[in-house]
């Protein structure tokens, strides 16, 4: 068998990461009813590159203000975690600003407050922005091109780069607003 990022062990690790906050959702419970077969099927679909993301779940939240949410199904979240597990360290070292705190390990509210309390003693500016439809307005071609540039510069085997670029392309170019369900 050829080398691949999409091993059963990596899929299982991504599953455990994914279920930390989603374990009680209907999608996660359904997935766990036939866990081993579902993990094996996902592993095979990724290895043969036949994986296709499922439809998104659509709902509206009202706090802090009304907004539409298109959430990935549990199985698709596992694939997101596979990708994150592989590229997170690269992003941490090369891409993210040191004072960006959103969705980063060891950079939660406490880190942000400590950083802000240190910086407030100097002349500092701070901004919190909520851009309407931010994620849906990102140019996916540009995003994927930037992603490719970063991955191609890594000192990793070509099979790793091929797997990561294929999965990132599938995820980036999936439109969650098409074929969603309530």
Name each model-derived stretch.
Residues 1-40:
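Non-catalytic, polymerase-adjacent accessory regions of viral genome-replication enzymes
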Residues 20, 24, 37, 41-52, ...:
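Short helix-loop boundary/capping segments at the starts of domains
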């Amino acid at each position: 068998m050829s080398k691949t990022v999409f091993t059963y062990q990596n899929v299982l690790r991504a599953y455990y990461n994914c279920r930390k906050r989603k374990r009680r959702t209907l999608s996660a419970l359904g997935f766990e009813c036939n866990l081993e077969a579902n993990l094996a099927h996902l592993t095979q679909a990724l290895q043969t590159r036949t994986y296709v993301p499922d439809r998104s779940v659509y709902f509206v939240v009202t706090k802090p203000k009304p907004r539409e949410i298109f959430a990935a199904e549990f199985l698709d979240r596992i694939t997101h975690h596979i990708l994150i597990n592989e590229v997170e360290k690269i992003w941490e070292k090369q891409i993210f600003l040191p004072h960006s705190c959103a969705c980063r390990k060891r950079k939660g509210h406490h880190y942000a407050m400590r950083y802000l309390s240190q910086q407030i003693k100097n002349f500092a500016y701070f901004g919190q922005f909520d851009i309407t439809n931010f994620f849906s307005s990102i140019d996916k071609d540009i995003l994927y091109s930037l992603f490719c540039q970063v991955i191609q510069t890594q000192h990793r085997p070509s099979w790793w780069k091929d797997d990561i670029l294929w999965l990132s392309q599938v995820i980036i170019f999936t439109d969650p607003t098409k074929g969603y369900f309530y």
